[in-house]
A protein has these predicted regions:
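Short glycine-rich anion-binding loops that position phosphate/pyrophosphate groups of nucleotides
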Residues: 44-45, 133-138, 144, 205, ...
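Glycine-rich N-terminal segment of FAD-binding domains in flavoprotein oxidoreductases
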Residues: 27-55
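N-terminal glycine-/serine-/threonine-rich phosphate-binding loop
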Residues: 1-38
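ATP/nucleoside-binding phosphotransfer catalytic cores, i.e., glycine-rich phosphate-binding loops
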Residues: 187-190, 194-248
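Class I SAM-dependent methyltransferase SAM-binding "motif I" and its flanking Rossmann-like core
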Residues: 136-187
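Short beta-strand segments
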Residues: 39-43, 68, 104, 129-134, ...
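Ligand-binding beta-strand-loop-alpha-helix segment within the catalytic cores
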Residues: 2, 61-132
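A glycine- and small-aliphatic-rich helix-loop capping segment at beta-alpha/alpha-beta transitions
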Residues: 52-61, 85-89, 144-155, 216
Length: 248
């Protein structure tokens, strides 16, 4: 399988190219169906992309529904500790008309919230998934493509590993792993792959090795590896990603 790989020499070009492609895909959906559903992950490298996307012209945001890949239980989605906080700061604050009914409510009854979210996403066609994997190849809180929760339709409760939880010990977020919640809600790989279009964004020195996991000859259990099955996958590489020639 030949991968659609886009290399960018600057962060500015990285952010601009991805936001323009995302905006174009949203516009196409709005023209063809009158609505658009967008799935977003919450890695830091999406912040600049979301800022530019929020200012894109020609998008009626009142007809756009947002879904989030994962979030922790017991955390308000508007809190700085929430995985959805970047969506609030970078996208929703600028476009309050966006439908937020499908965002994760980590303060709700967990089993009821999973049922609610799964019903909503299974009723929709996800037009665009804008994703940025974690350093281990995880997608949100989902870290194994072969786990039971990765094969269901919709969302599930999950217990992220210590390695996943450590990745959220960051300035302005959690000060130590002991503060990071031990349970969350995450979307299955099966549901992610139902998206019409997937933009996979890689940036940061620690993520260079992830490109190899997208190579067709590499077997991996990391969820990022499942994305290579998708016929409309586009991989965007930031300037700090070292490229393996075999993956070109």
């Amino acid at each position: 399988v030949s991968l659609n790989v886009h290399r960018h020499t600057s962060i500015l070009h990285f952010n601009e190219a991805i936001s323009k492609q995302a905006a174009a895909l949203i516009r196409i959906s709005l023209v063809s169906t009158g609505q658009a559903s967008v799935l977003l992950s919450s890695e830091p490298e999406l912040e600049g992309i979301l800022t530019l996307l929020s200012a894109s012209e020609g998008i009626d945001w009142s007809k756009v529904t947002l879904f989030c890949l994962s979030d922790f239980l017991g955390v308000s989605r508007s809190s700085r500790l929430s995985m959805q906080n970047d969506l609030h700061r970078k996208l929703l604050a600028q476009n309050p008309a966006i439908s937020t009914k499908a965002l994760i409510n980590g303060e709700s009854v967990p089993s009821s919230e999973v049922t609610r979210l799964s019903f909503l996403i299974n009723q929709q066609t996800i037009d665009l998934a804008l994703l940025s994997p974690g350093e281990t190849g995880a997608l949100g809180l989902l870290e194994s493509a072969s786990s039971e929760i990765s094969t269901i339709d919709g969302y599930s409760l999950c217990e992220p590993s210590d390695s996943i939880r450590k990745s959220f010990v960051q300035p302005n977020r959690f000060k130590s792993i002991n503060e990071v919640p031990q349970r969350g809600i995450t979307l299955s790989t099966k549901s992610i792959l139902r998206a019409k279009n997937i933009l996979c964004c890689l940036e940061g020195n620690k993520k260079s090795a992830l490109l190899n996991l997208l190579d067709d000859g590499v077997i991996t259990d990391a969820p990022i590896g499942a994305l290579k099955k998708h016929p409309a996958l586009h991989i965007h590489l930031g300037p700090s990603i070292s490229v393996n020639p075999a993956a070109s």
